[in-house]
Amino acid sequence: QIKAWLDQYGLRVSGTHTGLAGLTDDVLEETIAYHKAIGCENIIIPFEKLENKAAVDAFIDRVNVLQPRLAKEGITLHYHNHDHEFKPNEDGLIPEEEILSRTSINLEVDTYWVFAADKDPVAFLKEHKDRISVIHLKDGIGGHEGKSLGLGKAPVLQVRETAIALGMEMVVESEGLEPTGLEE
């Protein structure tokens, strides 16, 4: 039914945020079937705590099982970052570095969270361009305080220019509603 509605309005689903609970062995076939039914070729894991070595290892092990399984079905697996992946966890690991070095998962880079972690989002996009096909373009003033585009401190114009130059799709995400969320 969803596919018919998408077709009726000329829409496509570029990706879904599907947590690991939707990618366990007991529901994986159903998740794959759903994505095929709606014509969606991208599954993005939207968040994992990764608070210690055990959590990082378990996540990486699961990703390394899921990725080839999904690829056989024509589905690409991605991970959506936040700022905590760029900071040492309770065991001193930097989860983003572990993900990059121990998997080949694609990245859906939330450029604001890279900025909020005191990293350069433009440099990150350039350095990992072969693993990034889509970004979240978002603004904020640091920490967990988002703003409407152009009202924060993140380098959104430079990020946008870089993403265009590198052929990356952009999801424009607003954490603020100034002036109304629709007008921005």
Regions found by a protein language model. Name each.
Residues 1, 21, 48, 112, ...:
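Flexible loop residues that form catalytic
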Residues 1-7, 144:
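Glycine-rich, proline-tolerant flexible connector loops at the mouths of alpha/beta enzymes
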Residues 5-7, 34, 126, 162:
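A general structural signal for stabilizing positions within well-ordered secondary structure
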Residues 7, 71, 164, 168:
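Short polybasic/polar patches that bind polyanions
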